[in-house]
Swiss-Prot record:
Positions with a binding annotation for ATP: 11, 59, 87, 93, 104, 114
Any one Gene Ontology BP term: UTP biosynthetic process
Stated name of the protein: Nucleoside diphosphate kinase
CDD domains: NDPk_I
Superkingdom field: Bacteria
Gene3D superfamilies cross-referenced by the UniProt entry: Nucleoside diphosphate kinase-like domain
Molecular function terms from GO: ATP binding; metal ion binding; nucleoside diphosphate kinase activity
Function: Major role in the synthesis of nucleoside triphosphates other than ATP. The ATP gamma phosphate is transferred to the NDP beta phosphate via a ping-pong mechanism, using a phosphorylated active-site intermediate.
Subunit: Homotetramer.
Length: 141
């Protein structure tokens, strides 16, 4: 198995519920290490740029509004098969379909306010990490 890095966002709904620590604990208990992390309030331009691939979709405006509605925690996770492992921990995008014990089943409100984002491929992880972090901000552990 290969050590990978993946990108994660703890979204405004989860930050507002004060469950950041509980979510990070799930990552760490599953063998993922946080190698970069920061809380930030996304600007409209940052959210639009990050989600640019969805710009033509009907939900884009609502997504940008939600992601700018409060602070988020952006982080880089590292570990064996980090991308797949993180996606398993998150659960299905729609929390009603997420398996019991997953982050979204336990902390998400809806398909829109679904607590977390995680990269879905190595290419996406590289792009998303670079969007928020300079190489010097990511520290191997």
């Amino acid at each position: 198995m290969a050590v990978q890095r993946t990108f994660s966002i703890i979204k405004p709904d989860a930050v507002a519920k004060n469950v950041i620590g509980k979510i990070v604990s799930r990552f760490e208990e599953a063998g993922l290490r946080v190698v970069a992390s920061k809380m930030k309030q996304l600007s409209k331009a940052e959210a639009e740029g990050f989600y640019a691939e969805h710009s033509e979709r009907g939900f884009f405006g609502e997504l940008v509004a939600f992601m700018t509605s409060g602070p988020v925690v952006v982080q880089v996770l590292e570990g064996e098969n980090a991308i797949v492992r993180n996606r398993e921990l998150m659960g299905a995008t729609n929390p009603k379909e997420a398996a019991a014990g997953t982050i979204r089943a336990d902390f998400a409100e809806s398909i829109d306010a679904n607590a977390v984002h995680g990269s879905d491929s190595e290419a996406a992880a590289a792009r998303e990490i670079a969007y928020f972090f300079a190489a010097t901000e990511v520290t191997a552990r």
